[in-house]
């Protein structure tokens, strides 16, 4: 079965029920979803688009690229693309000309959909890349896409195609080089969605408060698939605003967010047990959740955040338990591997590490992507001979009574700092710094050092009203950790640089301080 067929199977018997309600008061029924996706799918198929065969023989259907702001219609475009048997490519609407030049050249979409205000410059880039069709889509249900679709029939029989057919391309963040397009199949998305629906206890009477962007796996695949494929209602916010979330929480049962969202909610006095009285689940992902935020949220609301672990190439692969009978939700851990997914930790030689030892995280299962678009060598080096995907993350699997089988992420392998021959894992140092009085959060990274190879550097954000000094922070760190782990320099910043999903961009910090110790990059 493909993703759209699974959606149709999840329609409630009464299609006049509301499926999506927006923060502006718009209501979309399940029948509206059926009709709108049919009309959009008919438009796409009327364009006589053609796919192509990749170098490895895989057929890539026509690609529809969406560079749009968040709207229900943008979600319907995604569903219609899958209904038409095509491939959906979501792109961050913040991307500008140079970035879009790369993505459109690499993915070679047949269709680009953009915000009306971006049409002039983006259509020029698109046509230079031989894109055949460029449509516009506004957040207020305007644009040429909907204008053209309005003339189409609202009846459409989805094509019959295999679950192994490609249906989406997700580009990785590309913090260490050019972004890679992960090729995902219907089977990848559907297996992951069904696992999460069962593991997190989704039911038709759930209401998901959706405040995430939809150009990312978290907001588009995890959040929307869980709700729609379980017949649940979406309460749709155009963007994340703490006050708007608090206003709508009483109408919801599930909320998914990134750590930055939770820290901003914690800054609101209105975040109380009473405000969360009807909630059954808060999920966090896309970046590590600070243990202090985990504890503060539980104390304020009576709810323990469920932290999970996933990536563009694999969907979700680990999750803390939902049901208390399955185990506790632990701070600083992403939980055990999801049912049907295998996760292991190996050393540099590829041999399995003993429980509790730090190593490289690898994953295998039906959720794992097919490969990287146009990068056969990168695809080959990312998998072992027995099909384990190398995530690039470093972590460990718990061995204690409380955390046995639970995965903890230490950091990215590329973030490992080797100073004077010793390995330093930034997450460990950050954990110690974050426990110091007055510290809100920190980021630890390495830069070239003429003597040690790399020097440990920290960027620290103070709590409101706190006065932090570099000397004091270094002195306190020396009392907690071995000297080779102590940052040689500490910078106190108003905030850490982050991407759209709240991940700290350490590459920007490294670039800014690359010449700090006067050594040349290796």
Regions found by a protein language model. Give the residues of each.
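Conserved AMP-binding/adenylate-forming
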Residues: 26, 41-95, 423
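Conserved ATP/PPi-binding loop(s) of AMP-dependent carboxylate-activating enzymes
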Residues: 322, 336-340, 349-382, 422-424
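Structural core segment of the AMP-binding/adenylate-forming
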Residues: 83-148, 464-466
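Conserved AMP-binding A3 loop
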Residues: 27-31, 167-194
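AMP-binding/adenylate-forming catalytic core of the ANL superfamily
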Residues: 365, 370-371, 381, 394-485, ...
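Conserved AMP-binding/adenylation subdomain of ANL enzymes
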Residues: 190-207, 215-254, 268-270
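Gly/Ser/Thr-rich phosphate-binding loop
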Residues: 252-257, 266-328, 342
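Conserved pre-ATP/AMP-binding loop-to-beta segment of ANL
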Residues: 15-16, 152-171, 177-178, 201-207
């Amino acid at each position: 079965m493909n993703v759209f067929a699974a959606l149709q199977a999840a329609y409630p018997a009464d299609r006049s029920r509301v499926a999506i309600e927006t923060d502006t008061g718009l209501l979309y029924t399940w029948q509206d979803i059926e009709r709108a996706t049919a009309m959009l799918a008919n438009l796409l198929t009327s364009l006589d688009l053609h796919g192509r065969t990749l170098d490895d023989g895989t057929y890539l259907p026509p690609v529809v690229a969406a560079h749009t702001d968040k709207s229900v219609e943008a979600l319907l475009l995604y569903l219609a693309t899958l209904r038409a048997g095509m491939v959906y490519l979501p792109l961050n609407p913040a991307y500008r000309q140079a970035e879009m030049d790369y993505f459109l050249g690499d993915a070679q979409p047949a269709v680009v959909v953009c915000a009306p205000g971006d049409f002039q410059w983006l259509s020029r880039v698109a046509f230079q890349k031989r894109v055949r069709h460029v449509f516009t889509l506004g957040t207020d249900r305007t644009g040429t896409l909907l204008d053209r679709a309005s003339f189409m029939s609202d009846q459409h029989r989805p094509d019959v195609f295999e679950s192994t057919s490609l249906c989406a391309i997700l580009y990785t963040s590309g913090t260490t080089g050019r972004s890679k397009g992960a090729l995902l199949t219907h089977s990848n998305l559907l297996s992951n969605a069904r696992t999460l629906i069962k593991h997190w206890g989704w039911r038709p009477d759930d209401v998901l408060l959706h405040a995430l962007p939809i150009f990312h796996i978290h907001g588009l695949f995890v959040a929307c698939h869980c709700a729609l494929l379980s017949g649940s209602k979406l309460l749709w916010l155009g963007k994340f605003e703490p006050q708007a979330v608090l206003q709508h929480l009483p109408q919801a049962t599930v909320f998914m967010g990134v750590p930055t969202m939770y820290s901003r909610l914690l800054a609101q006095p209105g975040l109380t047990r009473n405000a969360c009285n009807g909630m059954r689940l808060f999920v966090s992902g896309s970046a590590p959740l600070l243990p202090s935020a985990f504890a503060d949220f539980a104390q304020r609301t009576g709810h323990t955040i469920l932290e999970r672990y996933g990536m563009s190439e694999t969907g979700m692969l680990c999750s803390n338990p939902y049901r208390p009978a399955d185990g506790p939700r632990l701070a600083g851990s992403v939980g055990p591997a999801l049912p049907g997914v295998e996760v292991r930790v190996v050393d540099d030689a590829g041999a399995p590490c003993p429980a509790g030892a730090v190593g490289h995280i690898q994953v295998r299962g039906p959720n794992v992507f097919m490969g990287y678009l146009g990068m056969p060598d990168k695809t080959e080096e990312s998998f072992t001979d027995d099909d384990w995907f190398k995530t690039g993350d470093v972590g460990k699997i718990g061995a204690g009574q409380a955390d046995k089988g639970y995965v903890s992420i230490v950091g990215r392998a590329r973030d490992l700092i080797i100073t004077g021959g010793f390995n330093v894992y930034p997450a460990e140092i950050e954990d110690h710094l974050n426990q110091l009085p007055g510290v809100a959060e920190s980021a630890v990274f390495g830069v070239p050092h003429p003597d040690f190879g790399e020097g440990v550097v920290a960027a620290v954000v103070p709590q409101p009203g706190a006065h932090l000094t570099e000397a004091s922070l270094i002195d306190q760190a020396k009392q907690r950790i071995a000297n080779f782990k102590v940052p040689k320099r500490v910078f106190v910043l108003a905030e850490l640089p982050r991407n759209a999903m709240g991940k700290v961009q350490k590459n920007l910090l490294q670039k800014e301080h690359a010449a700090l110790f006067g050594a040349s990059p290796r």
